């Protein structure tokens, strides 16, 4: 329905911008028919868009090689991290090997104790004994050195910040070492900025597949829930299934996933229009820039956040991967303290934010195609949104209703039928 709505107002071979790109799914669906621009305030989305949406020549795609990524720089960083964290790495491997396929009992309980008491940045206290030999690296003083110079060798951000619950330590060592490798390749001139974004996008993909969290995002790290020794508890079968999933993810090899994504990308990448471009800006700054108007884009696709959820919390880890800045963190989820919250997510600001957005679209002579899911969590009712649309686009507003299922995280029922609206605002001179 979204593609059809965009097709209905956009001329053949015209151009479309997805102003809140997110996962870039919509932009990808348009790439064969239009010049596509995409924008997102989050840096991880921007990097993914640079890999998926921007044009790359056959020469660039053919020049991508795993030998570079897993070459000298990768080996150098991995060797140093493996030396520094040798004791917890060895203990973790033994725990995962000893568990086998038995997800309860004394052996699993030992792993749970390790999982629940892993040291992390600025919190070395009350850690499992396997961290004793390397505990100084987790001290606030050591972390501060990295905050002052994030390029310090060895790259250690994930190893220090996210080793349990989110990832296993061996996965963190891999993530840090791959990131070090592609940064050094860029710094030494062995790869271009364009290639660096593509290589980094594969690492974002890996994080999504191995993270230990509730739901399909990074907002809530998953805990290992208890089971009774005789498995007679009401939720024991569910908790066992979750334990199995956690162990399966912990055992996954990042390098293998990275290689698979690399091969898939090289085999399936289809170049779109050479003018395709990704932006990483607040939409107000982008739409107010005279250079934007000069692009003569026909249509804006708009799917901003409509609830009071902190969306930046959902993707704080890929954001930190891209920024690689050893951030200040807080709470059990180790969220960035500087995380961004859109005005669309704040009840007192949402309507005015929408009004600003539609005004800027109109000033740029853009058709606007808006997705809106009418769920219980939405801040703005559909009536308010359509009213603002009519304020700027008058009678040239079409509202369509499309039902779909959505995930209702942490609530019952878990899957809920929502009203999905597609609002088309047609610009007329």
Q: What are these model-predicted stretches?
A:
Residues 376, 382-429:
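Class I S-adenosyl-L-methionine
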Residues 51-155, 161-164:
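Conserved phosphoryl-transfer catalytic core
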Residues 1-15, 19-20, 25-33, 48, ...:
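S-adenosyl-L-methionine
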Residues 16-29, 38-43, 204, 292-314, ...:
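Conserved proline-anchored active-site loop of SAM-dependent methyltransferases
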Residues 328, 366-372:
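Conserved beta-strand signature within the Rossmann-like core of class I S-adenosyl-L-methionine
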